[in-house]
Structures are given as structure tokens and as C-alpha cells.
Amino acid sequence: LGDVYKRQVEIHAQGSEKAVEELKKALESRPPERSVIMEIISAHADEPPFDSFEIIESEKEKGDIFVSPDIAVCEKCKGELFDKTNRRYLHPFINCTQCGPRLTIMDSMPYDRVRTTMADFPMCKDCEEEYTDPATRRYDAQPVCCNKCGPEVYIIGSEKKGAEAITATREAVMAGKIIAVKGIGGFHLCCDAKNESAVKRLRELKNRPAKPLAVMLKDISAARRECDFGEVQEKLLTGWQKPIVLLDKKTSGSLCESVAPDNPTVGVMLPYAPLHLLLFDYDDGVEMTDSLVMTSGNVRGAPICRSDEDALSEIAGFCDLILSHNRRILIRSDDTVMDTFEGKPYIIRRSRGYAPLP
């Protein structure tokens, strides 16, 4: 019995000394999925006898407070995303307690919906029921939303939005166009990584003649087709952080030469936002590539664009179409880049999925 305060996490537990110690050991050895336990401090406290379990509303605090990084879309949400019977079918912003934006949408602490950009989107009745029910996977999931009440994608300068915008974007990619896509922490510039002329044009427009471009591959099977890698790299590719991982290219791969010219390696990541998954797989009849160049949407020396205004003023000249959405990004977050040495991973650029973890 007891209660839980959502500060960092404060648990008031009552029971036999053995039971309380077992709880502590369980937290240390089997922490909740995707959680990071920095330290457990325990002390005896004078409390009246508990007769129930409660989760107490968050309190504002001064001092150092842990902030969660953004978390790649989880397998359960992926399943719902492509389940025609699910009310979040093809919803570009599906999330739950195990995944979704965190740092990038946060205005202030503690992390509650009213202090995030999801405050712009009042929950519908169905989402509110899930949000307030401890038995659901979306209990207290701050960005929870659905097709009825959530953010919406659209093409800047066009009336196309929602499904029409996604289909138009996919068609543009397959026609050899360059697009800008707003993701979790900012915009990417994107094109078909198998289309030599499209990749060369992107390089010319961005004035990036030789530096390798990152690619996003549809799934781990596509990654295996294009690159050689071992268990350590696969864990990085498929983990909840979804960084860019530097991998050895296969000579038999289908990525065009201009992706990483005269370079034996290429930076690869897998889709980490629901919108990325929908770019690769959507119920619209478009035959889509499984390989996309996905490079930071910025001008040289500037941070990644995070708003429509940024995109229009800085990268509109680099692309033919801008796919955006109306969930505001407060904190920019570029893709983390990782490599391995002697079988151990190390970070080259620390950002999305890892920041602000110490």
C-alpha cells in the first residue's frame, strides 16, 4: 500500500521490512521499460497507516529535475498505427507512456500536458478516458491524442492536409523531388536515396559536395541489405533512442553513390516517429522507396529549423515541398550520431533520444 508522487519519482510504501526491501530490489533490477534509474534513496518516514494506493498530482519543485528524452515510437503503437480497426489507424502522432515526444515539446517542469505544446490540443472524451485510467497504456501519457483531437499534418502553401498531404509527399519523393519534413525535433530534408539525380540536386542546393548524407531505411531488413553490421549496431538501430549509426556499406547495396561518395561507411537510422513510418507505408497505392536521404533541415552553421517560419526563410530554396504539422517544437533536437569501436558504442553527436540524460 502507499502512494506515488510524480516528482522525479517519490514512493511512499508501507508494509513489512522484507516486502519494502523486495520492492527496492525489484526497482533496481527490473526498472520499468525505457526508464533510467539514476539513484534510489530510501529512508524511514512517519506516515499514518495506508488503506489504499494513490498516484498524487505532480508538484512544482526547485532544483535539479530529471527531464526525459524523446522516445521512438514503440512496437505496440506501431501495431495500432497500421490496424484498420484501431481508432488511431494511420494517426501521425500516435504515442503512449512508452514512447513519443518529451523534451522537444516541454515548456517547463514538471512534465505535465499543460506545460507542453500538447496543451494546444484539448483531449477528446475517448483520449481523456484513457489518460485518466491507470489500467491503460496511456494513463498519464502527456502527449496522448488521436485523429479526432490531435495535431495535423499539412503542406505549407497548399490546401492539402492529413491523408492528402502524406500521399502528395510520397508521390513527390517518387517523382524525384526534394521535400522538407517536420519531425520530432525539427525539419529534415529528404529524397529517394536510390535516385542519383535527386541526391545530387540536394547536394548542389545545400552546397554539400562530398560530406556523407544520413539515410533512413524502412526497417532492419532494408538495413541488412545495404550494410554490414553486428549485434551491437543492430541494438543501437532498433533501440528506443533510434540514433544514426555509422555502418559499413555493402557493395551489393542499392543506395546511390552520391549518398556517401568515396566513403565506405554511411549513417543509417530507422524510423522513429509515426510520421516517418507513414512516409514509407501508407494505404494510398503509391509504390514507395524503402530508402530515404534524411539530412538536417538547416543552412550551414545554423541550428535545425523547428517552425514553419524557420523552414520558409531558411530551407524553402532547398526543397520542392514542405510537409509540416501544427505541434509546436519548443526545444530543437537533431539526430544523435553513433559509431562503435572494438565492439563498444560511442556517441559522436549527442542529441535526440539521449539528451538531456547525463
What kind of region is each of these model predictions?
Residues 6-14:
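N-terminal alpha-helical targeting/anchoring segments
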Residues 8, 20-23:
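Accessory nucleic-acid engagement/destabilization modules that flank
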Residues 32-53:
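Conserved short beta-strand edge segments in small beta-sheet-based binding/regulatory domains
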